[in-house]
UniProtKB/Swiss-Prot annotation:
Involved in the synthesis of both phthiocerol dimycocerosates (PDIMs) and phenolic glycolipids (PGLs), which are structurally related lipids non-covalently bound to the outer cell wall layer of M.tuberculosis and are important virulence factors. In vitro, TesA has both thioesterase and esterase activities. Exhibits thioesterase activity on acyl-CoA derivatives such as palmitoyl-CoA and decanoyl-CoA. Also displays hydrolytic activity on ester substrates, being more active on pNP esters with short carbon chain lengths (C2-C5) than with those bearing medium and long carbon chain lengths (C8-C18). It comes from Mycobacterium tuberculosis (strain ATCC 25618 / H37Rv). It holds the Pfam family Thioesterase. This is Thioesterase TesA. One of its GO terms (cellular component) is plasma membrane.
Amino acid sequence: MLARHGPRYGGSVNGHSDDSSGDAKQAAPTLYIFPHAGGTAKDYVAFSREFSADVKRIAVQYPGQHDRSGLPPLESIPTLADEIFAMMKPSARIDDPVAFFGHSMGGMLAFEVALRYQSAGHRVLAFFVSACSAPGHIRYKQLQDLSDREMLDLFTRMTGMNPDFFTDDEFFVGALPTLRAVRAIAGYSCPPETKLSCPIYAFIGDKDWIATQDDMDPWRDRTTEEFSIRVFPGDHFYLNDNLPELVSDIEDKTLQWHDRA
């Protein structure tokens, strides 16, 4: 495990550095953080603050959210990933080292965006996926058979939202676009030959019934590099009670792969 100390690299901490001087290897790696369904960048402030200055952190605000809770407009995971990639591209030079973390739905989006970075020639150090089933192993394929009310009930359990919101008819009607988003999440898949050329590290809570260890283990088939899965105590939002240990693991692995490059 790497020792914690002052920053090893120049540049800003919470965003892209405009400093173009020096060897690209000396640039601090940037970790892009993808929130869960219904989450916003603000929900990951505590997570971001656990890192040292050795890793830059950028939490992604999904298009159409404007800092509000709730899912962004979502036709499909790849379509939203295209939008996010177009939004993010100006923030990274081709040689800047990047890594990706995604929790729940954010894991699917982070994977798709990481693939786009890889295809564009960027240095992707690692992909960290949290509480997110591997493509083709996502549960609740039966969502097409659920009523609107049943699907919204499932959504509240997936996101931790207050279910009382959906007892109000006006709020319920306004939440109907969420149904399309949940179906898009449940229907996400990609060809089996689609892989990242960086390591994949998976994290999960031992009491998570939304994404189980069996659901996440097939992430090993989505990398040509090493894979591991770590189980923490807790449910789908296990990370809230395990931030120091989780962040330490992510930071250590990011810096180790950065130093190998």
